[in-house]
Every structure is written in structure tokens, then in C-alpha cells.
Amino acid sequence: MVSKRKSRTSKTIEDSCIHLCSVFFRFLYYTLPALFLFFFLLYLCLSFTTGISYNNFHMCIFSRKFNDPYCNTAGSKPGFQIISEENVTFAGEIAGDRVSKDHNKILNSVPVQEHKTKNKVDLNSLIELKAEEEYSKYIKPTSEDEGYALRAAIKYLYLQRSWLSPGDENLNKPRSCEGKGVYVYDLPSKFNSDLLVGCNDILPGVNLCSYFKNEGFGEAIKNLGKGWFATHMYSLEPILHSRVLKHPCRVYNETQAKLFFVPYYGGYDVLRWHYRNVSEDVKDRLGIEVLKWLNSKESWRRNAGKDHVFVLGKITWDFRRDKDPWGSRFLELQEMQNPTKLLIERQPWQVNDIAIPHPTYFHPRTDDDITRWQIKIMSKLRRNLVSFAGGARPDNPNNIRSTLIEQCISSNQCRFLNCTNESCTNPKNVLDLFQDSEFCLQPPGDSATRRSVFDSLISGCIPVIFTPYTAYYQYAWHLPEDHRKYSVYISEQDVKEKRVNVVEILKAKTLKEKKDMKSYIVQQLLPGLVYGDSNAKFEKFRDAFDITFDCLLKKINRSVV
């Protein structure tokens, strides 16, 4: 009897277990797919919403090169992403000693080599905070999309500032080249020097041959003294090529290189087709060929071009052809998304576009050349409160130049140099004007940036800026975060709507304000805005080339592990 009772109890327990298991597995079978489907649909919904609100924005650049505003929608194609490119992500960046001690205090608090995950989050958070604080500082967004665009521009700017390098602290000590090898490709001549051979026919009716003398500096201007040349605004490519060939850390073995320099003169390549009726295939051909040539190199394939640098001596928009037939598509090619591009004007939503100073007429060789010039312009008596060298843009109703010219010529404290009659082709005319003025008006011209900004700065003339895209959102490595140290900002919109008189605003600046700005420009900024010649030997100063390559090496060290 005992045995039968135990057996009956055991069977009851077994039946209960089977029943519970059956219920459990039926729950899994019928409920989990529904839950999975619910969360998947929720994820898709959130992703779609985020994509609309964050990844797409619409910005327009006005230029006389285009009949209509030149507009870009970020997020619409691979070249216009707000989210960082494959090789650089805000959340994925490691902070620490990459932050310049000279500039961004907001990034300085992140400890070096400690809690790397926390550092990534901290850097990302700090950049997000800065973007939120500053996105409407200069331009008041008129739509949500424009607000996102401005935030993105600020984020990329501060990420670029995080690559600032103070250089060797003791410039008198021998430079260490450990981990700083620079390799210069020996490209077939069709990609560089051959483009200069037809210098009398690059632009129809214009002979550029004199500008290619002296390694791209142009002919010497003897009446201005030592180190002054008639340098063309688009001469950056041969100037930097000549200089990098004599870089103190140049290596001749690819395996020893940290940075690879590609001397393709893309600016001259695209310039020769600007005013000729040729097909888009012709405009794009040489750029595609240089990428095919590079793709045959293991050094290019190893890091997908992330450690490669191109110098393009024109504005970024000349290499981003979209609907308008102007220019090439070189910077829109997928292979060009990873390399670093040095340009005189960058695309503010491309983190690997780096803007560096326009070439000026001054190319010192020694510290003494710089010091002598600093002393001269600091002691210069300036008879004009303000000046403007330029021409009107009557075919562009959005340009403020006509209003500025009108305000200038109606004041006895403003001097206007009309560039439409070729007065500005003589460098001495422009430099004399700037050295004789306290403030120099710098409105946008064919594009947002102006070579004249740098001509005025090296002349000790305080630039007056009307849009942040002229300087503040451009030259992260060469101009400081605080624009008030070296410039005056007046809203372009205020001028356009004639709510302000620029001359009257500048009259209100105190003697101390002007003295402090001029001193900062001449003593602190000037050496880093000029390109020394290929034999330059600087011990006290770093010129624009030195700053650029110090920062490039830091960027690449952070991007390529």
C-alpha cells in the first residue's frame, strides 16, 4: 500500500511539471515574437524620426559663380554627413593631451590616459555643450534645420580644435622626429608640374607664368623689401609642396612614415576647366586617375587613406560639383572621405576639410625677417579709421558690398580702393591701404572667405567680419576661439537691412580696444599666418606651415591606431 501511494504522488508531481512546462513554452512561442516585433517597430520609428530631425539640414552659399544660391542638404549623400565620418566620431575620440593648452579650455579638463571610456563621453559632452551654447552666437537660425546645421558646424570646429598642437615647447632644441615621419609621394608629373607648363593658358586670356616663379611665390617685389613676392591667391599647392620636400622629418621609406603627402595640384587641375566648355568626365578625369594610382600602393590601402594629406589651393566648393556644372566632384568621391584635405576654404560640415591661411605676399626666411616686420607695422601711423579694398557685386542682391561702399565713401574716415579697375592687382596698393588703416572691412566675395583677411592681418589692420564662415568657422588651427582678440564682428543681416552704420560702430571702439587687438594680431598671430620659403629656418616662431603639419601629425596619430 505504501508503495502504491508513493507512485501515485510521484505521477501527480510529474503531470504538474509537464503542465507548467507546456504553459511556459506556449508563452514563449506566442508572446516573444509579438514583443520582438513591437520593439523592432519602435526602433524603426525612432530611427526614422531622428534621421529626419538631425541628419538633414539645408544651407545655401551665395556666389556669383552660380545663378542661384548654391545649396547643400547634409545627410542627403555620403559626402554631407553630420554624424562623424568613419574615421572620426565624436563619441569615439580619446581626449587628453590632444587638446591645445593655448586654446580650448572647455576641452582641457579631460585627464590623460585615465578612464578612456569616460574621456570619450566627456569630450563628446563638452563638444555638445559648446555647440548648444554657440550655435546662434553669430547667425540666428530661421528654422529647426538651420539650427541643426549650425550646431553641427560648431561640433566639427571644436573637434578640429582638439587636434591643435603647441609644437615643440623649446624651439631651440633639436626637433624630435620619432613617430613623425613624413613621406612625399613621387607622383607622375601629369598630376603636378605638367599642369604648370601651360601657365599662359590655364585661364583664358590670363598669363599666370610669373606667379609660378620662386617655388610658387611669384616674382619678388623689390620695393617692399626682403621676403615680399607677388603671390597668386591659388598658389598654395606648389608652395606647400616645395616646403614639405624639405620637412625635417621627411622619410624616404614608406614603412617609416606616419603621414603621407600627396602632391596632386587639384586646384590647378580644376582651374583650367572653369571657363571652358568641356564635359564633366574631362573635369573629373585626372582626380580619378590619381586615386587609381594611389590604390595601387599598399601604403594607401593599409589605412584606407586616413593617414594621407592632400593640399588643394582653392575653395572646397570647386571640388563638390552638384547640380551646377561648375568644378569637379573630386571631394565627393568615396575614396576622398578618409584623407585630410588642406584648403583655403573648407566645407563646414566635413571634419576632414581643414582650412589653412590663404597665401599672402610675405614669405620670411628667418626670425629676424618676422621681427623686423612686426616692429615696422607696430610703429606705423594709421591715418584712416577704416578702409575697404574690393568691388561691388551688383549681380548678387544678397551681397552687402554695395551697402558698405556707400557707407564708406560717405564718411571722411573711410577710404575705398575700387578693385573693379584692377587697382588691386598691384600688391603695393593693397598693402599700403591696409598699413594706413586701423580697421579693414572683409565682406564675403565670390565665396565666404577672403585672402584679404590675411593681407589685412599681416599689415596690422583689424579685420571687420560679417559672417562667421569668413573666418570663425574656418581656421581652427590658426585663429583663436575668441574672435574679439583680433577682429570685430558685425552681422551681415544687420548691414543688409541697413540697421547699422559700420563706420559709426567702429568709431565707438576705444583706443585701448584698438591697441590691444593690434598688439595681439602683430605679436601673437602674424608669425603663424605666413608661409616661409622652402629654406626657412625659424627658431623663435612657427609659421603657418609648421602649425599645419604639427596639427596634422597629431590628428593622424589620433585617427590611425
Curated annotation (Swiss-Prot):
Keywords annotated in UniProt: Glycoprotein, Glycosyltransferase, Golgi apparatus, Membrane, Signal-anchor, Transferase, Transmembrane, Transmembrane helix
GO cellular component: Golgi membrane
A GO BP annotation: protein glycosylation
Gene name in the database record: GT20
Protein name (record): Probable xyloglucan galactosyltransferase GT20
Known role: Functions in xyloglucan synthesis by adding side chains to the xylosylated glucan backbone. Involved in the galactosylation of hemicellulose xyloglucan.
UniProt similarity note: Belongs to the glycosyltransferase 47 family.
Domain of life: Eukaryota
